[in-house]
Amino acid sequence: MEKITFVIPSRNNLEFLQLAYQSIRNLSTKHEILVLNDASTDGTQEWIDKQNDEDLIAHHNPGPERIGIVGMFDKGIEMARTDIIMAFHADMVACKDFDKNILKHLKQGTVVTGTRVEPPLHPDGPEKILKNFGIEVDEFNFNTWYKDSEALKEDKTTEGIFAPWCMYKEDFLSIGGHDELFAPQSKEDSDLFNRFS
């Protein structure tokens, strides 16, 4: 299987970042994980420095000024050592075979997104499934997640493009990455993919 670089910006999100990291390491292929620490003060950098993982890369903005998620995604994608990149948030958890399911749909010139499963904190939408696997880290259980998320998998295409998204690094760089106009807003993905299509 081709390796993916999971690009994960994070700011003071250590407990969720650890969960995201573990979920990626639980996949059958050891992918590259690139964590972009954006001036965190919660021990994130210390935790990263203690990891003995040759496929964990870190970029540390010591602050005090933040770069923001848009700038950090762009920096991480530039740093990625694989041909395929995955925009992954620090509070996301990969389900079993997440990588295999994404890669079977990926080809040059396309963007593939994974359907998000979220607790009912935000409004429902066609790009996600509302189901509560725990709002806090200590409420989350990997065994329950892996068992129950299998029943949620469908082989269908949903409308919209949102994180987690995957594409070839070359395709991302060909359109110049994110537009700084949207930094650090939540519409950066929509703009990026409108320019890509």
Specify the residue positions occupied by each region the protein language model found.
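N-proximal low-complexity "stem/linker" segments adjacent to membrane-targeting elements
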Residues: M1-S23
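Short, acidic, metal-binding catalytic loop of nucleotide-sugar glycosyltransferases
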Residues: Q22-H31
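A conserved acidic beta->alpha catalytic loop
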Residues: N37-E46
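Glycine-rich, basic loop-to-helix element that forms the pyrophosphate-binding segment
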Residues: G63-A80
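Short aromatic/hydrophobic "clamp" motif used to bind/position activated sugar donors
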Residues: I85
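Conserved donor NDP-sugar-binding/catalytic core segment of glycosyltransferases
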Residues: D97-G134
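Short, flexible, basic/aromatic active-site loop/helix in glycosyltransferases
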Residues: N132-T158
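Donor nucleotide-sugar recognition loop
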Residues: E159, L173-S197
